[in-house]
Amino acid sequence: MQEIEQRIYLAATYDTKGEEAEYLRQLLRRDGVMVVTVDVATSGQGSPAMVSAQEVAACHPQGAQAVFTGERGSAIVAMALAFERYLAGQRDVGAVLGIGGSGGTALVTPAMRALPVGVPKLMVSTMASGNVAPYVGPSDIAMMYSVTDVAGLNRISRRVLANAAGAIAGAFRQARQPIADDGRPAVGITMFGVTTPCVQHVTAALHDRYDCLVFHATGTGGQSMEKLADSGLLAGVLDLTTTEVCDFLFGGVLACTDDRFGAIARSGVPYVGSCGALDMVNFGALDTVPAACRERLLYPHNPQVTLMRTTAQENARQGAWIAERLNRCEGQVRFLIPEGGVSALDAPGQAFYDEAADAALFQALYDHVRQTDRRRLVRVPCHINDPLFARAAVEQFHEISQ
């Protein structure tokens, strides 16, 4: 079969960003790369783009009329979906470059997020100097701040856009080069600072046989790992640090989404999980902790991070929440119960040590997980950071991944 020539897809709302898009197209063509320009404007006006807004909008499940509504908010949401579906249908996407303000960024980045990790994605945006998590999510999108508004060419915007063109062209070429692969299958492992010793022991034990990909459990970390599982890129998962559930249920700043564990259920990938750092909810600096939580047991982890100890009632709730999702998993699942504590702070003499709270978590798991030959809870009578726990996790993983 003849190899399909890859191209850089350049997406912009041509009714407001056409001048900048054409400037980028010229730079990329001068650099010798093939470019496909795509108009994602919701105004319905004509443009010189190679792919018209009408063609993109037609990819919406309800047709172009769902996009060209005349109402900005709903039109952006609809065009974002249409562009995501359009891009997913193209077989020659070698990289994606987008430019835009808040609307254009919200419109282009969902399609970028849907692409596999490793396909270069660069968004030049007025929003890139703030909180970019809603745009980047679990993907490898690179965000470049436009400095000036994306509203015409000037000496600043020309330089920034020229740098963007050079960056995406370089990434496009590099992505086509083979990278070293020693043949070891990849496993995903979740970690937090307070479960680091556990993960270090696990990765040391697995290193010879597996390429260990460690994800920081910051909300997007878990999403990134599950995105790889959904993409079939992981041979197994050791989800030892499920702390993102605390933040999701109790208002922390490092929350997962409601789809946590969803990729495990969908993919059936061999899964070893545990209760790492389910004793804490993450907030920012101490003065950012919600007023309703100020009288709780708080621990300043550093000047930027304040931790709140979960209660027995909260632990029972999150144990039931996790159990309900584990029950959806039909692949091989082992969920380990570290009876000696779930984090470095949850140990004798440490700030969050609370046997009753931990017992409520463990009991909720026992009460709600429907255990089968393929889905089992495993008692481990030691602390999560004890080398014996890591050994148990590795043994369970080897058992289910043979």
UniProtKB/Swiss-Prot annotation:
InterPro entries the UniProt entry points to: Tobamovirus_resist_UPF0261, UPF0261, UPF0261_C, UPF0261_N
Pfam family of the protein (one): UPF0261
Top-level taxon in the UniProt lineage: Bacteria
Disulfide bridge partners, by residue number: none
Gene3D superfamilies: Uncharacterised protein family UPF0261, NC domain (3.40.50.12030), Uncharacterised protein family UPF0261, NN domain (3.40.50.12020)
Family to which this protein belongs: Belongs to the UPF0261 family.
Protein name according to UniProt: UPF0261 protein BB3289
Taxonomy of the source species: Bacteria, Pseudomonadati, Pseudomonadota, Betaproteobacteria, Burkholderiales
